[in-house]
């Protein structure tokens, strides 16, 4: 006797083995076909009018994505500083102002070079301020003894911080001198010599640092021009920083390295 299992009974009750009934097709009329075509056209038009995109949560970027005006520079800045990857939206046929990956990579490099230049200029600016207090024979003898004794003969916090800042500045200068190439030991030595204080006076150290700042400023101008030529956006903040550093260099050149620290610190925007 063939007894059915519970699963077989359940399947039969739920019509799993029953043939699917074919629905009768009603003959289509030209009028119904026209209505279907019109509905499809309206749906497509609606999709084109409002392209889908993922909101970034930032009104500025969302508006640019909606208006199809987002640039490669926007893409770079969003990814680097906000941690947002706009590639999902960019792949939605938005008119990003960069035709290929090579151009986008060039824009990214020019932008990174600009920030490297600005960082180096800020380090140099800070070092010029520190030079007003930590230049001279006494401070350099303290550092010399500190090096020779391996730290046994200590130095105060501010002097140690100043020495580290000078080394960081030298590394940044070497990177700029490499012009995108490899930073060789020769370049490091040249940059170290450029930024070395020795036993010089604060006026001489200030004047020498200004010459190095001019090298960095020329590099910044070149990279800003490169970014513009690639179709990238140069922000007003970048131009403001350029004017600020140029103004400080002009002031030091006018005074022959003898600066009033309060006056120097008050300079901004090329004033």
Swiss-Prot record:
Entry keyword annotation includes Coiled coil: yes
Record region (Disordered): 1-39
Name of the protein this chain belongs to: Coiled-coil domain-containing protein ORF29
Top-rank taxon, per record: Viruses
Keywords associated with the record: Coiled coil
Biased composition (Basic and acidic residues): 20-37
Coiled coil: 208-228
